Curated annotation (Swiss-Prot):
Record's protein name: Mammalian ependymin-related protein 1
Stretch forming the signal peptide: 1-37
Top-rank taxon: Eukaryota
Keyword Disulfide bond on entry: yes
Pfam family, one: Ependymin
GO molecular function: calcium ion binding; lipid binding
Gene: EPDR1
GO cellular component, as recorded: extracellular region; lysosomal lumen
Function: Binds anionic lipids and gangliosides at acidic pH.
Alphabetical list of InterPro entries matching this protein: Ependymin, Ependymin_CS
Quaternary structure (record): Homodimer.
Top-level taxonomy: Eukaryota, Metazoa, Chordata, Craniata, Vertebrata
Subcellular location: Lysosome lumen; Secreted
Keyword Signal attributed: yes
Length: 224
C-alpha cells in the first residue's frame, strides 16, 4: 500500500517494538495451543455403586467390599465381602455420614452397632483441579483396552507424590487410588464393577440397633 513502509525499514524504535510484539504474539499463540492440548482433570461421577479391594500397610491385608458412594450428600457405605472362609474374621458394614460427622460400624451377623466421630474432613473421590498429569495408557490386551489417565499431587518443588489416582478417560470412572508416605504405599484401593446411581438410598440409614450404639470400634477378629 502507498505510504506504508516495510516492517524491516520502519525508522526509529518503532520497528524493533513491532518485531517484539509479533514475537510475543507468536509465543502466546504457541502457549495457547499447548494449553488446549494439555490434559485437564475430568469430573468423576458423583453417585455410583461398585466393588473395591483395599490394601492397608498397617494390617498387611487386602479387604474386599461393596461400595456405595454419594458425593452429592457426602456419604459412603462399605459392606465387607466374604470371598473365603477366614477363621475368626468378623464382617462389618460401615456407614460414613460426613455432613453429620459420624461413622457407624455394624456387625453383619448380629447387627451390633458402634457409633464414632469422624475426625477427617470429606475428601471426594475425584481428581483435584490442581493435580499433576503423569501419564495416559491402556489397560488390557488387544480388543479389550480401556484408556486411563494417571494423576498425582506431585509439585515442582517436590520430586515425589503422596497420592496417585487412575481414572478412565471415558466417563472418568475411578480405577485405583494409592497413598504413599516416605516412599512406601500405606493405602491402595482398586475399584471395579461400577454402576452409576444409588439403587437403594436406604443403605445409608443405620439399623435400629444403632440407637443404642456403643462408642468404641469393634475388633475385626474374635477377641471381643
Amino acid at each position: 500500500m502507498p505510504g506504508r513502509a516495510p516492517l524491516h525499514t520502519v525508522p526509529g524504535a518503532l520497528g524493533p517494538w513491532l518485531l517484539g510484539c509479533l514475537w510475543a504474539w507468536t509465543l502466546c499463540g504457541l502457549c495457547s495451543l499447548g494449553a488446549v492440548g494439555a490434559p485437564r482433570p475430568c469430573q468423576a461421577p458423583q453417585q455410583w455403586e461398585g466393588r473395591q479391594v483395599m490394601y492397608q500397610q498397617s494390617s498387611g491385608r487386602n479387604s474386599r467390599a461393596l461400595l456405595s458412594y454419594d458425593g452429592l450428600n457426602q456419604r459412603v457405605r462399605v459392606l465387607d465381602e466374604r470371598k473365603a472362609l477366614i477363621p475368626c474374621k468378623r464382617l462389618f458394614e460401615y456407614i460414613l455420614l460426613y455432613k453429620d460427622g459420624v461413622m457407624f460400624q455394624i456387625e453383619q451377623a448380629t447387627k451390633q452397632c458402634s457409633k464414632m466421630t469422624l475426625t477427617e474432613p470429606w475428601d471426594p473421590l475425584d481428581i483435584p483441579q490442581n493435580s499433576t498429569f503423569e501419564d495416559q495408557y491402556s489397560i488390557g490386551g488387544p480388543q479389550e483396552q480401556i484408556m486411563v489417565q494417571e494423576w498425582s499431587d506431585r509439585k515442582s518443588a517436590r520430586s515425589y507424590e503422596t497420592w496417585i489416582g487412575i481414572y478412565t478417560v471415558k466417563d472418568c470412572y475411578p480405577v485405583q487410588e494409592t497413598f504413599t508416605k516416605n516412599y512406601s504405599v500405606i493405602l491402595s484401593t482398586r475399584f471395579f464393577d461400577i454402576q452409576l446411581g444409588i439403587k437403594d438410598p436406604s443403605v445409608f440409614t443405620p439399623p435400629s440397633t444403632c440407637q443404642i450404639a456403643q462408642l468404641e470400634k469393634m475388633s475385626e477378629d474374635c477377641s471381643w
